[in-house]
Every structure is written in structure tokens, then in C-alpha cells.
Amino acid sequence: MLIREFRVVLPLTVEEYRVGQLYSVAKTSSQETSNGEGVEVLVNEPYKEPEHEGQYTHKIYHLGSRLPGWIRALIPSSALKLEEKAWNAYPYCKTVLKSPFLGEKFTFIIESRHAQDNCKTENIHNLSEKELKERTVEVIDITKPIKDPKNYKETEDPTKIRSEKANRGPLEEEKWRESTEMPIMTCYKLVTVEFKYFGFQTKVENFMMGIEFDLFTKFHRQVYCWLDEWFGMSMDDVRAFELKTKEDLKKKLEEKDENKAAEK
């Protein structure tokens, strides 16, 4: 089992990020869904529990060709999907990913907390002494170059983008966190991964953590660079955008079946 806390620093207020995160999740889901692969939203509704209340979502990720060949070799094509259940009681959020095929052999949990600070809270998740010893910490600076140059887009580079609506940016690499002219917040994302599969555990767990680093980096660069698209939106505006996106995703996932039918 691996436990890693990713700390993502952003030039936003915690309330601004609430809107920006939801908008960007919906937009990226739409961008990454086509021809039967991508995100299927089954449920998106309010929930209420004794400890938390917020928005509950249930999604299916149809992965298909998006996984490396060595992982696809482990499981049949019918099992190339992940089930995600998320409880967004902002500023606390919990996401659980499961593989219907792997069952109890695969555990993937993300717990997110958000604070108006500059990466200074050392145990925001209230971990035990044992958990703290097992946890590693990785700070993500959205201005640092992404690992794979092929994935670089100037329109998603915070050092190139200025938000006219928010009057922020472009961000100067590394030095922007010292600015007193912008708000500073941190997303503290605690990721727990366990893959109980003899001979592959270490490789898969490290692979998943690497994927999360890349996803968190890319996503939060987008959140900032799309500021002028979502800045000023209300929660009602975001929920309407999510609803429209849900319908669009359904159509895109149906494209593969329609294409197959046309080929017969």
C-alpha cells in the first residue's frame, strides 16, 4: 500500500476553487469522451449524512485503449472500466475508485481538503502517527513545466495566461507564490493505493501514483488557465453546466455503438 499527499498550490480563494473545480471536471470529461470511451455519469445529486452533506456523484470510466498495454494484458477487454463514487462536502471531498473485475484486490481512495494557506498545514487530514510515517508528500507547482513535452499546450500554461476577469497572471515560475497581490490556497489530496496482485503490486501502485501526479498537474493548470470561462459563475450556473455535460457525454458514449451498427 502507498499513501501519498499531493499539495497543489493555486492563486485562488477556496470559494473560487469550488466553482472552478466543478466547471473544469465537467469540461475535461467532455473533452476526453468520444467513440465509446471516456466518462459516463450515472448519478449527480445532493446527499446528506450525519457527518457531511453535499453532492454525490457516481461515474463509470470506460478506459479502453487509454491504458498501457501491460495493464490491458492483465485483464479482459470487458473489464477495462473503473467505477467512481464521490462525496463532495466541500471543502472536504472523498473519492473512491473501484474495478468491478479486480474487486477487493484494488483500493484507490482520494481524500481532499482545501485551505487558504501556502502549503503550510502539515497534518490537515488528521493522520495517526503510523499513517504519518507511511505518508510521503509531493508539492505540485502549476507553473513548473509538465513532464511530457508532447502534452504541452501554450493555452494551458499558467506562465503564459492572464485572467482579465480576475486580474491575475501570467504567473512567474516559482516566484508567484511569494506574491501578496493574489490569494493563495492549497488543495491537500491524500491518495491511498493498494493493488493486491502478486508480482505486480509495486509496479502498479507506483504507476498509479505517477498517473495521479500528472493528472493533478494537468487539471490544476487547466483550472487556472480557464479562469475567464468560469470566474463569476454561481453554483446554479455550474450545476446547469454539469447537467448539459451529462447529456453530451451520454451521446458521445453512444457513438461507438452507432458506428458498429453502421458497419454491419
Curated annotation (Swiss-Prot):
Keyword Heme attached: no
Disulfide-linked positions: none
Compartments it resides in: Cytoplasm; Golgi apparatus
UniProt-annotated stretches for the region Disordered: 151-174
Source species, domain of life: Eukaryota
Pfam families reported in the protein's UniProt record: IP_trans (PF02121)
Listed InterPro entries: PI_transfer, PI_transfer_N, START-like_dom_sf
Gene Ontology CC terms: cell periphery; cytoplasm; Golgi apparatus
Gene Ontology molecular function, alphabetical: phosphatidylcholine binding; phosphatidylcholine transporter activity; phosphatidylinositol binding; phosphatidylinositol transfer activity
UniProt keyword annotations, A-Z: Coiled coil, Cytoplasm, Golgi apparatus, Lipid-binding, Phosphoprotein, Transport
Gene3D superfamilies: 3.30.530.20
Post-translational modification: Phosphorylated in response to activation of rasG.
Coiled-coil features, chain-numbered ranges: 238-264
Keyword Nuclease part of the UniProt annotation: no
Assigned protein family: Belongs to the PtdIns transfer protein family. PI transfer class I subfamily.
Function: Catalyzes the transfer of PtdIns and phosphatidylcholine between membranes.
Protein name: Phosphatidylinositol transfer protein 1
Source organism: Dictyostelium discoideum
Gene name tied to this protein: pitA
